[in-house]
Amino acid sequence: MTTPDSRVTIHMAASLDGFIARKDGRVDWLETADSFADGKTLTPEAIATFLRSIDCYVMGSRTYETALRFVDQGHGWAYGDTPVVVLTSRQLRPARDAVEFYAGDLVTLVRERLQPRFRNIW
């Protein structure tokens, strides 16, 4: 979904068995090197610049729960003060003031709540 003022980017990952995490909850297979084919690299500065460009994150409840486990393990909250919308019908604990929960139509969420407020929605 795109408007002249905002863009929604969907980023999904899954292993061949259809799950992101291992049975023990680890997602270490997602960790990759910062160098790629043809000698291209990602510098820490490039990554930081990219992450600062994201105005709002939208995630499912399982991804959110994984992020909370990282916090509990001492890794910190990966999203800083950037607003996070968690798609869920369950009662979950908010990790930060910037976290809100949503259960409803995604088109309504994007068009009525996110696009008026944010330009780069992930």
Name what the model sees in each region:
Residues 2-122:
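Portal/gating segments that form or line small-molecule/metal binding sites
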